[in-house]
């Protein structure tokens, strides 16, 4: 059993490493926040699918990675912004645009986990979890 101090960074690192190794799927310990991150990645077209699985009594989230016809993933970079030691909060007017709108930022807001674009539209700010492009 691994005890990590930053489960979101662990999840993002597992996805990043699996993409670099050209794996078709990757498993990570499940949580509500990681499930929401996977949901957003699927909605935005960065992963093929995800599902909750249970192996040996442990709840996992299985992420199915997506590759184009040239075997290149839509995810080229994943950056963790807010960390346990240095939280980053922004208002609705300060939500970062990633690569001029080509990438996404993912935030936790009072209205749930959403992309920076959705948060701007709804006029809410929150904690910037990561940027993906």
Curated annotation (Swiss-Prot):
It comes from the Bacteria. Signal peptide: none annotated. One of its GO terms (cellular component) is ribosome. InterPro entries: Ribosomal_uS8, Ribosomal_uS8_CS, Ribosomal_uS8_sf. GO terms for biological process: translation. The keyword RNA-binding applies. Keywords: Ribonucleoprotein, Ribosomal protein, RNA-binding, rRNA-binding. Coiled coil: none annotated. GO terms for molecular function: rRNA binding; structural constituent of ribosome. It holds the Pfam family Ribosomal_S8. One of the primary rRNA binding proteins, it binds directly to 16S rRNA central domain where it helps coordinate assembly of the platform of the 30S subunit. Belongs to the universal ribosomal protein uS8 family. Part of the 30S ribosomal subunit. Contacts proteins S5 and S12. This is Small ribosomal subunit protein uS8. It comes from Koribacter versatilis (strain Ellin345). The gene is rpsH.
